Amino acid sequence: MSIPNDLKYTKSHEWVRLEDDGTATIGITQHAQELLGDMVFVETPAVGRQLKQGDECAVVESVKAAADVYAPITGEVTAANPELASAPEKINQDAYAAWLFRLKPANTADLEKLLDSAGYQKLLESEDH
């Protein structure tokens, strides 16, 4: 499985990409979508919602299970991916392109607490055992 090097990751399988405009784009990882299977529903947080790192903020539902998505960093939701309401399967097609929501980070230092691609790879290897 390919793990993009330009993203940060959480132990609960969310990814974060810091954009040029200072916002952070968030989604679930390829590993998470493989575990869940075919997506049938996605609930994203409301624009304007204030999130703290670790807050439950979205839900992804598949034919197998529903899973909470946690805010990887603290900030204000600035956008939610409108395509996922009618086409949740986009997450299965490309988990790193089918973002869930965007935040304006309250503190970019939160990103330093997240895993890089090598750290995330080690996490996946430890979960396989």
Curated annotation (Swiss-Prot):
GO terms for biological process: glycine decarboxylation via glycine cleavage system. InterPro entries: 2-oxoA_DH_lipoyl-BS (IPR003016), Biotin_lipoyl (IPR000089), GCV_H (IPR002930), GCV_H/Fam206 (IPR033753), GCV_H_sub (IPR017453), Single_hybrid_motif (IPR011053). This is Glycine cleavage system H protein. The glycine cleavage system is composed of four proteins: P, T, L and H. HAMAP family: GcvH. The keyword Ribonucleoprotein does not apply. Binds 1 lipoyl cofactor covalently. The modification N6-lipoyllysine is found at K64. The glycine cleavage system catalyzes the degradation of glycine. The H protein shuttles the methylamine group of glycine from the P protein to the T protein. It comes from Nitrosospira multiformis (strain ATCC 25196 / NCIMB 11849 / C 71). Belongs to the GcvH family. The lineage of its organism: Bacteria, Pseudomonadati, Pseudomonadota, Betaproteobacteria, Nitrosomonadales. Transmembrane segments: none annotated. GO terms for cellular component: cytosol; glycine cleavage complex. Keywords: Lipoyl. Its cofactor is (R)-lipoate. SUPFAM superfamilies: Single hybrid motif. It comes from the Bacteria. Residues 23-104 form the Lipoyl-binding domain.
